[in-house]
Amino acid sequence: MTDDDRWDEDEWVSVEWVEAPDDEDDEGDDEQSAPVPFTYDATVGPDDERTADVLRHGDVEVLGAMPWSSNGTFLVQVTCGADHLPAIYKPERGERPLWDFPGGLWKREVATSLLSDHLGLGLVPTTVQRDDAPLGAGSLQAFVPARFAEHFFTIRERDDVVPALRRLCAFDLVANSADRKGGHCLIDEDDRLWAIDNGLTFHTEFKVRTVIWDYAGEPVPDDVLRALDRMLGEPLPRDLADLLDRSERDALRDRAGAVLAGGRFPHDPTGRRIPWPLV
């Protein structure tokens, strides 16, 4: 990777410290509350083989609160032996449930990652359940070292990304994503697409709201259809099934069957099935 390919400062994620540094000389300094640059440092990536074990068993240190989040969302460092990585921690106690999505949104974050893995799509960073994290039970998701100035609306016409966007569009229909904003589509330094912020998923009613309507009427990718066919021919993995109640599992299979039978991306005749804000 050349120097031109590296992030510039505008692309770094910013975090706000949970507590100001304990320095008497800086007491009362307004700069303590300002966001600070964060430099990515990890020995395992968002979906390496060891990542899930590190997230499940590692020591969790809270680094700061992520700004602009509607729910309590924290940047943490997870260390397990010689391995370490930053992660996004969403504790249940920090949630602000919606009228149609009760508490436990973090479980849907985990379930979405498991569904992506089960279908072989690799769209969602490794996400696990942690009951012993600093602020209580919640999800830990491997942090993606993305180009944060990029989002769906800056990458939607890139030929090298469109195939992954098409798979994500189909995946969101199956997972019933009600909040696929443009900023929830990340591109990492290897130009790989990642889907984050997946807490509003798996409702029993059709709730899809997404910015990705570009492929309406076009065929769903064959690899996605084959994956759905396999999924419908066998029981759901136990760890995924345990995160959903029976009605949610049945609705998941119904949506998968509908996408498989239809074979094409649907239209939005209302023009209102989009999230807000768009990014």
What does each of the following model-derived ranges do?
Residues 21, 35-37, 46, 86, ...:
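Proline-rich intrinsically disordered, low-complexity coils
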Residues 1, 36-39, 66, 231:
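Detector for methionine-enriched segments
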